[in-house]
Swiss-Prot record:
Residues 173-203, 211-230, 236-435 are annotated as: Disordered. The keyword Nucleus does not apply. It comes from the Eukaryota. The gene is WASF2. This is Actin-binding protein WASF2.
Length: 493
């Protein structure tokens, strides 16, 4: 529906009733001529309005052009007539000048009452006035105007404004939710993508032939292999000593390895000596280790399964450490030498009832050295002198006597004042602490509706440009400030 700005009156020239006259034709001609003259008068009036508006706009445009022309003239004089050789322009004078900055004026409220054209205003004034419902506004409890229930020119604007503010609020809540999730789970964005399953490995295995493909679920068909002492490789499964020939002898070209007699070997230390019943076993192990080129004798066929031929016997487990206060075991037969004495055993320490020393308490004020126990007796001259034993934990100091009177002396003064118990005062309760405790316990405060509405009206502008700019700023901003006038989560009814 187009908005008619100007209507030429009268619209109809000949639609009138004729009076009771004899000359009807002459009367009709006069009425039509009068209506044409009235239309010409209305047209001239509207032409004046149109040209008046054009004159106002042209005058504004001319004033802007004249101001720009004056600035251009001043700049032209400075540019063309300035001689840099004669007049020096200081750097300070250049920096003190402000740079040009254009001020953009947004065109809004195009259909406001102030911008209403005069013809439209005249058309509006011809309409019927609304009923005086504003007289009932003081009697309403909700504070709304009674006339707005009958006619509300700002209804569509308020509806659009409410929708824009709700969208802005939802955007801010969504951003706060994302920030909270990101803060709670910082590694959320570093999720490893799922590996794409392809049959490339399967085809790579099958390109050499189906018989070479090994299944991962089935165990390997090949038994584990073992390496002999002479470098040959053997298998663990189904090894029979009688079916295998002895390993080949070493080449005659290589020099024979030197053989050592048991008498020339040095005696083992006392900590790693073997017991007497293992001498024969130790001798066999040494002989197999010293001369690896000699093959061991083949076991009989009917014997019980034992170590396989060509295999080195497993090393003996390490002997237990020597016990305290026990003499070292005698060396095995054949290895002892009277000229080489065994190393001395580690010195034995006197047993102490407390294995873990408690943390040292503060030193006592006075200790009578006569009450300390005597030091332990030293070892024999042949052994090394043992280190001094750890001191016993100090007990309560004995009360010192003052001379022969037998009277107890005064107790020593305390070491520091830190041992005094501190007096615990009850916390001072005031209105602030009570309010804070109420908030922490989850009590919800009642929100003042009128105050919140007034704050929203003060903060949010009541025009289209301000609302749109606010929404754009919220959408494209990365601010971490969670406090906002749109935050409704902090208060609840």
């Amino acid at each position: 529906m187009p908005l008619v700005t100007r209507n030429i009156e009268p619209r109809h020239l000949c639609r009138q009733t004729l009076p009771s006259v004899r000359s009807e034709l002459e009367c009709m001609t006069n009425i039509t001529l009068a209506n044409v003259i009235r239309q010409l008068g209305s047209l001239s009036k509207y032409a004046e309005d149109i040209f008046g508006e054009l004159f106002t706009q042209a005058n504004t445009f001319a004033s802007r052009v004249s101001s720009l022309a004056e600035r251009v003239d001043r700049l032209q004089v400075k540019v063309t007539q300035l001689d840099p050789k004669e007049e020096e322009v200081s750097l300070q004078g250049i920096n003190t000048r402000k740079a040009f900055r254009s001020s953009t004026v947004q065109d809004q409220k195009l259909f406001d009452r102030n911008s209403l054209p005069i013809p439209v205003l005249e058309t509006y004034n011809t309409c019927d006035t609304p009923p005086p419902l504003n007289n009932l506004t003081p009697y309403r409890d909700d504070g709304k105007e009674a006339l707005k229930f009958y006619t509300d020119p700002s209804y569509f604007f308020d509806l659009w404004k409410e929708k824009m503010l709700q969208d802005t609020k939802d955007i801010m809540k969504e951003k706060r939710k994302h920030r909270k999730e990101k803060k709670d789970n910082p590694n959320r964005g570093n999720v490893n993508p799922r590996k794409i399953k392809t049959r490339k490995e399967e085809w790579e295995k099958m390109k050499m032939g189906q018989e070479f493909v090994e299944s991962k679920e089935k165990p390997s068909r090949y038994p584990p292999t073992l390496v002999y002492q002479n470098g040959s490789i053997g298998s663990v499964e189904n090894v029979d000593a009688g079916n295998y020939p002895p390993p080949p002898q070493s080449d005659s070209i290589s020099p024979p390895s030197p053989s050592f007699s048991e008498d020339n070997l040095p005696p083992p230390p006392a900590e790693f000596s073997y017991p007497a019943d293992n001498n024969q076993r130790a001798g066999l192990k040494r002989s197999s280790v010293v001369s690896p080129s000699h093959p061991p004798p083949a076991p009989p066929l009917g014997s019980a399964p034992g170590p396989k031929p060509g295999f080195a016997p497993p090393p003996a487990p390490p002997p237990p450490p020597p016990m305290i206060n026990t003499p070292p075991p005698p060396p095995p037969g054949g290895f002892g030498s009277p000229a080489t004495p065994p190393p001395p055993s580690p010195p034995s320490f006197p047993p102490h009832p407390d294995f873990a020393a408690p943390p040292p308490p503060p030193p006592p004020p006075a200790v009578d050295y006569s009450t300390l126990p005597p030091p332990p007796l030293s070892q024999s001259a042949g052994g090394a002198p043992p280190p001094p034993p750890p001191p016993p934990p100090p007990g309560p100091p004995p009360p010192p006597f003052s001379g022969a009177d037998g009277q107890l002396a005064a107790p020593p003064p305390p070491l520091s004042d830190t041992t005094k118990p501190k007096s615990s005062l009850p916390p001072v309760s005031d209105a602030r602490s009570d309010l804070l405790s109420a908030i922490r316990q989850g009590f919800q405060l009642r929100r003042v509706e009128e105050q919140r509405e007034q704050e929203k009206r003060d903060v949010v502008g009541n025009d289209v440009a301000t609302i749109l700019s606010r929404r754009i700023a919220v959408e494209y901003s990365d601010s971490e400030d969670d406090s906002s006038e749109f935050d409704e989560d902090e208060w609840s009814d």
